[in-house]
Curated annotation (Swiss-Prot):
PANTHER family: GLUCOSE INHIBITED DIVISION PROTEIN A, METHYLENETETRAHYDROFOLATE--TRNA-(URACIL-5-)-METHYLTRANSFERASE TRMFO. GO terms for biological process: tRNA methylation; tRNA wobble uridine modification. FAD binds at G9, G10, G11, L12, A13, G14. GO terms for cellular component: cytosol. One of its GO terms (molecular function) is tRNA (uracil(54)-C5)-methyltransferase activity, 5,10-methylenetetrahydrofolate-dependent. NCBIfam families: gid_trmFO, PRK05335.1. This is Methylenetetrahydrofolate--tRNA-(uracil-5-)-methyltransferase TrmFO. It is an enzyme of class 2 (transferase). It is found in: Cytoplasm. Its EC number is 2.1.1.74. Its cofactor is FAD.
Length: 437
């Protein structure tokens, strides 16, 4: 029996885990090495800093990410509460002012009487549990060594890439139109249309641009969900036109037709002064980014306030290491959470932290940790990452394909997802502690 939970890592997962444990009366030590020691991608000491995008993805139940958010809200998620307060326009997606979001999460956790935030790097795993390790995709080398020595497991490496951000005032709006695909949502996106000649010139510049070199000790394994735009382009001349530059559902008012290709810009802060290039995560050198991306209509004079960056992402072989409760096999007092487990995405990481916070509290009190029901978004995601049949193991976003199928076939995808969501929420809302009941 214990009244304390130790959490290593103050990202989305660690922050949510700390909140869940503290609201259940536990004394929480939350260890975060920033700002004294920054990662290659972080730039502040804020807890829950967003580094890849300001979007928390779809908020509608038509998308499984929306279902996961709905379950988290029911469970009293801090990340969902703060995201709602910091929301910026993004159509049917949930996007936030990233600085306001992280600063609010930090202020709330630092002010909580049951939480002590310690700004130091942890280089060894404490042997007095329960302990939650939520050090994220940029786990420090010292902690990687500690984990490897402790678990004996092999680690896999792949790359995440962050998209550039430009100032709104530097854009040429005579070459840009507002709108969302198929008219869904408000006119929350800025669209930069390209004709065939413009696209081909942009494509050639992109695939021949100079990239930042990767570290020799890291094999180049790229996760599809955050692939650098130049890597995607190298697959073929039309790959981008069927990916982030797809024009479907967008009509250029200047021509009355769909463009040959389009680059979308999404608002990045509440003031509307910054926009990020949607789907344009990149590892190009900074000078090359200016040269290549200024070929996009509307961006010829763009001011880049942040260039795209490339960083290593670390995750464990969860099917070998973890139980669905997020406990390490053979070490029931040790929990892992967040992207370190192989979940991919902001919301997935926070959801993972939510479960870890609940279960670490239960373990501390001598209670049996819980497994979220498999027909819920939380349960389906954790089942996937801990299923030993997944070989080789790859990171995964939440999606409806992870949930158990319906007993009867429904051909219409939207209707099928609606039924899956209704079933999941009914089960989640009666699941006891996870549901907030």
């Amino acid at each position: 029996m214990s009244d304390k939970v130790i959490i290593i890592g103050g990202g989305l997962a660690g922050s949510e885990a700390a909140w869940q444990a503290a609201r259940r009366g536990m004394k929480v030590e939350l260890w975060e090495m920033r700002p004294g020691k920054l990662t290659p991608a972080h730039s502040t000491g804020y807890l829950a800093e967003l580094v890849c995008s300001n979007s928390l993805r779809a908020d509608s139940l038509e998308n499984a990410a929306g279902l996961l958010k709905a379950e988290m809200r029911q469970a009293g998620s801090l990340i969902m509460e703060v995201a709602a307060a910091c929301r910026v326009p993004a159509g049917k997606a949930l996007a936030v002012d990233r600085e306001e979001f992280a600063s609010r999460v930090t202020a709330i956790l630092e002010a909580h009487p049951g939480i002590t935030v310690i700004r130091e790097e942890v280089q060894a795993i404490p042997d007095n549990g329960p302990v939650i390790i939520a050090t994220g995709p940029l786990t420090s080398p010292a902690m990687v060594r500690a984990l490897k020595e402790f678990t004996g497991a092999e680690y896999l490496y792949f790359y995440d890439a962050a998209a550039p951000i430009v100032t709104a005032e530097s854009l040429d709006y005579s070459r840009i139109f507002k709108g969302s695909r198929y008219g869904r949502g408000e006119d929350d996106y800025l669209n930069c249309p390209l004709n065939k000649e413009e696209y081909e010139a942009f494509y050639q510049a992109l695939v021949t641009a100079e990239r930042h070199p990767r570290h020799e000790f890291e094999p180049e394994v790229v996760f599809e969900g955050c692939m650098p735009v130049e890597v995607m382009a190298a697959r073929g001349p039309d790959t981008l036109r069927f990916g982030p530059m797809r024009p479907v559902g967008l009509i250029d008012p200047a021509t009355g037709r769909e463009p040959y290709a389009v680059v979308q810009l999404r608002q990045d802060n509440a003031a509307g002064t910054l926009y990020n290039l949607v789907g344009f995560q990149t590892s190009l050198k900074w000078g090359e980014q200016e040269r290549v991306f200024r070929l996009i209509p509307g961006l010829r004079e763009a001011e880049f306030v942040r260039f795209g960056v490339m960083h290593r992402n670390t995750y464990v072989n969860s099917p070998r290491l973890l139980q669905p409760t997020l406990q390490v096999k053979g070490y029931p007092w040790l929990f892992l959470a967040g992207q370190l487990t192989g979940v991919e995405g902001y919301i997935e990481s926070a959801a993972c932290g939510l479960v870890a916070g609940v279960n670490a509290t239960r373990f501390a009190r001598g209670e049996e940790p819980l497994i979220p029901p498999p027909a819920t978004a939380h349960g389906a995601l954790l089942h996937y990452i801990t299923d030993p049949t997944h070989t080789p193991f790859q990171p995964m976003h939440i999606n409806y394909g992870l949930l158990p199928p319906l007993e009867h076939r429904v051909k219409n995808r939207v209707e099928r997802n609606r039924i899956l969501a209704a079933r999941a929420l009914e089960i989640w809302n009666s699941s006891g502690e996870f549901s907030g009941n």
